[in-house]
């Protein structure tokens, strides 16, 4: 049996652009794609923290070091510049690999730059009590 598991995410990125007239997709800074192990054309979930919307699209590579997170096409109606989003991917994993599976989590600052050394999520209740 194969299971679909969380593969990687870019956590709390800031939308820098929303281009309604583009065909679709989300353009992501190449440095962030590499850090999160996301490849161009890979299916990406976009969870908008600010608006509460969710959608699926695919990744396009943006200029390295630019910090770009550009929501393209019709999805631009649901995501505006300044919104905080989570960009997530999933992978099919063989049952034998599930116990040792480790997703990649990338935290970014307000300029969509990778925050070095911060790689582990803290569950909500633990975070609030700390």
From Swiss-Prot:
Catalyzed reactions: L-aspartate + H(+) = beta-alanine + CO2
Localization of this protein: Cytoplasm
Post-translational modification: Is synthesized initially as an inactive proenzyme, which is activated by self-cleavage at a specific serine bond to produce a beta-subunit with a hydroxyl group at its C-terminus and an alpha-subunit with a pyruvoyl group at its N-terminus.
Residues where substrate binds: 57, 73-75
Cofactor binding, per record: Binds 1 pyruvoyl group covalently per subunit.
Alphabetic keyword roster: Autocatalytic cleavage, Cytoplasm, Decarboxylase, Lyase, Pantothenate biosynthesis, Pyruvate, Schiff base, Zymogen
EC number: 4.1.1.11
Gene3D superfamilies attached to this UniProt entry: 2.40.40.20
Molecular function terms from GO: aspartate 1-decarboxylase activity
Principal subcellular localisation of the protein: cytoplasm
Biological process according to GO: alanine biosynthetic process; pantothenate biosynthetic process
Family note: Belongs to the PanD family.
Protein name: Aspartate 1-decarboxylase
Organism whose genome encodes this protein: Myxococcus xanthus (strain DK1622)
Taxon lineage: Bacteria, Pseudomonadati, Myxococcota, Myxococcia, Myxococcales
Gene for this chain: panD
């Amino acid at each position: 049996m194969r299971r679909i598991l969380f593969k990687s995410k870019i956590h709390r990125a800031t939308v820098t652009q929303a281009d309604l007239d583009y065909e679709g997709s989300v353009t992501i800074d190449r440095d962030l794609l590499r850090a999160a192990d996301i490849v161009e054309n890979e299916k990406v979930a976009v969870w908008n923290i600010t608006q509460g919307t969710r959608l699926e699209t695919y990744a396009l590579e943006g200029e390295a070091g630019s910090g770009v997170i550009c929501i393209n096409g019709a999805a631009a109606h649901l995501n505006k510049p300044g919104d905080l989003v989570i960009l997530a991917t999933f992978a099919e994993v063989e049952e034998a690999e599930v116990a040792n599976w480790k997703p990649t989590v990338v935290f970014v600052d307000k300029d969509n730059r990778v925050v070095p050394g911060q790689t582990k999520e803290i569950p909500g209740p633990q975070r609030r009590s700390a």
